[in-house]
Each structure stands twice: as C-alpha cells, then as structure tokens.
Amino acid sequence: KEGKKQMNQLKPMLLTSLKNYNRSQFVKDVTAGIIVAIIALPLSIALALASGVGPEAGIFTAIVAGFVISALGGSSVQIAGPTAAFATIVAGIVAKNGMDGLIIATILAGVFLILMGLCHFGSLIKFIPYTITTGFTSGIAVTIVIGQLKDFFGISYPDGVKPIETTEKLKAFFENFSTFSLDALIVGGVSLAILILAPYVLKKVPGSLPAVIVGILMVKFLPLKVATIGNLYTISNSLPTLHIPSMNLSMIGDALPNAFTIAVLAAIESLLSCVVADGMINGKHRSDMELVAQGAGNIASALFGGIPATGAIARTAANIKNGGRTPIAGMVHSITLVIVLVVLMPFAGMIPMPTIAAILFVVAYNMCQWRTFVHLIRTAPKSDIIVLLTTFILTVVFDLVVAIEIGMVLACLLFIKRMSEETHVDSWTYVDDDTPDVDEHLRRLPLQIRVYEITGPLFFGAADAIEHIVVKDFTTCLILRMRSVPALDSTALNALQNLTKVCESKGITLVFSHVNEQPMKVMVKSGFVDLVGKENFCPNIRAALDHAEKIIATAK
C-alpha cells in the first residue's frame, strides 16, 4: 500500500487532469495560458538581462522549461520559467564561467532534482528553516535592486569595469554616480510609477506591459538619449536550437557547488509555489513528481539556450485567477510565447533599459517579504534572528551558495544547542520516616535506592547530562526513569555505557524504567541490553522500584 502511494507520487498530474477534461475547461485553460504568457513576456526578458544573458534566453526558458514542467509536473496549475531567485547566482556563473559553465551547472542541477524526486525527497524540503528561505529571498531582492541601479540612473562605467559581486556593483555605482543620466531617470521614474499604479487602474492587465509600451514610446518620440536592449544585445527571433556544450571532469567539478545551489533553490521555490497553489484551488500536488519535472525542465532549458527555471508563484497565481486548472494552461502559455518570439521579438530591442530596471525593482519588492522579515526580527527567538540576519547578509555580501551552506550549518548548531538545553536529569527527592509533611502519594525509598528521571532527547548535544548522575557509595541500586526520553543516539549510549562501568566498579545494579521504542531499539541492537541484563529493564517505575527492593533484599 505504501509502495503504491509512492508510485502515485511519481505520476504526472496531466494524466490525472485529462480523465474528466471537457471543452469548457479547455477554453478556460487556453485563456489563462495566453494571459500568463503576456505577463511572462516582459518578466522573462527582464530576468534574463538581470541574469547577465541575452533577452531571448529568458523567453527560451519560459518556452522550453515551462512546457516540460507543465507536461510532467506534479501540480495542476504550476507555471514555470525564469525567476528572480536565480538572477544573481546565474549572473555570477556567467561572469566567471561563461554560458557553457551555466549550461553544465543547470544540467547537473536537473540531474540532482530528478534524483531528489525519484528518492522521494519532496517532503524533506520542509526541513529547511523558514528563517533561511526568508533571509536569502530578502537578500536576493536587495542584490537585484543594487544590480539594476546602474541602468535605472543611466550611469556609465569606464571601459574594463565590469563588477560581478554585489559589493563591487555598489562601489562602482557610487564611484561613477556623477555620470548619471536625467533622461534615463525620467524614463525609469515614469515606468516605475506605471508599474505601481497600473494594478489599481488596469485590473486585468499586468503593469509591466503598459510600462514597456510607454517606455518604448517615450524613447521613440521624445528627445531622450536612453540605452535600449537593442543597443546592448543582438536580438533574434529564431527558435531555440539544441546545443550540447563540451565538458570535462574539471568543468563538472567546478560546476557542482553551483549546481547543488540551483537544485536546492529550484526545489524550494517550486514546492513553495505548489503549496500556495494548493491553497488557492483546494488541491494537492505531488511533490516528488514535481521535482522530477523541474529536473527535466532545467535540463531541457539548458540544452536549448535557456537558464535555470522553477515554479513562479506570481505567474501561477495569475493562471489560477484567470481560470487555469490543468497543466494544459501552462503548455498553452509556452506555445503562446513561441508565437510572440517569432512575431514580436524584434521589437524587444526598443525596450529602454531603465524600464527593465523598474520592472525588476517591482519584482524585487514583491519577493523581498519585508513585512515577514521585520515581523521575525521583532518576534522570533534570538537563535532564529541570528540565522535570518546571517543568511540575509551573506546573500548580499557573498552569494547564495555561501548563504545557504552557512545558514543551514548555523541553524543546525543552534537547534542542537536548543534541544540540548531541553534535556535534563533530575534526582528524586529522598524522603524517609523522619521527613515531616510528606504527601501520601510519595513512596518512601530505602536509602540504598537512587532514582534519576531523564527528560528530553539523549543525543550527542545532550550526552553530558548523564554526567550529572551522582553515584553514592551507599547506593546499591540506581534507577534511570526514561519515560520522557523520545530518542537516543550512539554518543548518549556511550555515556550510558560509561555509567554502567562506574556502577559495576562500585557494585551497583543499574535498572532502567519505561524505555521508549526508539531508545530500546538502539540499546538492543548495540548489545547494551545484554550488557545490563534484560531483567533490569522494567516497564514502569513501580516495577522498577519493586525490582530494586528485591535486589537490596537479596544483597542482605
């Protein structure tokens, strides 16, 4: 039954959606697909430019990856394509390793994603802390804004100055700020105003479309000297073609860290988008199949001139709001973009760079989650705030690879510290006949019996709690009550073995009370139960105390 459930997780949602498909839903899917394509067009171009590649690469990604991920995906409504989350990391890879380096890293990331899906890792993404995803998402938003300041203000850099890192871009921006263009600022400001106001005026039309149109008209008919996409890139309306890069072991080795980061980021973004979509349509996605589809989509995108892709929350939400309910909508979105590529791509060269920067400013604002960021700073535990700020700062100052790696390690260490603080060992209060005002329910114990109650998980971070157990010379029997110990690892087991040796050297019998299932399995498998003696493991404290009293009686 479990195996059948896992196999169902690897079934494309398209096959399920087509079972009860009808003409009415087809019309809705086609309409939604066309609308989403209109939204995706300027975004794909802008995100491609932010990623340091040509504008057509963004369209290729939305076409190829978008189609494959919709056809094979585990979500009925997911729309995939280039996203802002990848912009800075892709730009860094292209600057350092060129397009072939990016293609290799993306293909490897696709392989990782497929393996993650086949190994049923879809549910494991939930173990990545919310503070890390919020931290690096906010960090990416800041890096996007910093990266677009140059084009928004029309600043010119001296020949040979091509900053790659975010800090280098910020330094170059301020050093050359005197070269800013008022014309660029006017176009960028108007575009930004349209992007902000359009949602309130044009309910059904994405703000990026009128912003692009107005930007083109301003540059075309007003005496404004502003750089356009056509000034910086060669525009082509040819369809994507297959390109397999030459690669060797050295190139593959260099690409592995970036590939891992792309894979993890794609998994997080896509599954987060699926969860949001599930809430909007009251559905249930198949996380493992979605990862496989993301992998296949990224491999296809890389081979056909695209960049890394993942599920896009904004485009997915637009698909749902416009009636899309099956993967057909995502496939129509890709087909529509093919038509747009052939017919309208030459006009893309007329789009002003300040307009592209304005679009990316809004994208960055929408993804930065600043309200969540501030809320966490105000209300989260100190350890979570440390992880949040560390991940955010490392994303901005260094890159996403460093941020995720150090963020995860730091989160794990702080979690271990927190869990170790929850584990404690308490000695039972010793009472005798001379102790006044003793509660009737307390059991008076012989002096020779000592009871310690352990609370919390016994693992390597809390193993030293065993050292708090004090063995008196007059003790004949030591009882460890473990009803509140849910887990035990080998480090803590080693500490218990050392305690056993101390007890043996002093002639003390060690008795265990109420050992839970997981700790008992560890003890049995390691031979610890045989070492202590099966008779010294009791189901509850009453049985353990009775057993201890028999041991004392026998010793007399």
Where are these regions (language model features)?
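Short acidic-hydrophobic, aromatic-tinged amphipathic segments that line or gate anion-handling sites
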Residues: L531-H547
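Short secondary-structure boundary/hinge segments and terminal tails
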Residues: A296, L337, K521, N540-I541
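Generic hydrophobic alpha-helical segments
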Residues: V90, L170-F173, I466, V470, ...
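Transmembrane helical cores of multi-pass ion-transport proteins
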Residues: K5-Y430, F474, A495, G527
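Active-site-adjacent beta-strand anchor residues
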Residues: A80, F512-S513, C538
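The feature marks cytosolic C-terminal regulatory regions of anion transporters and related permeases
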Residues: N366-L531, E549-A555
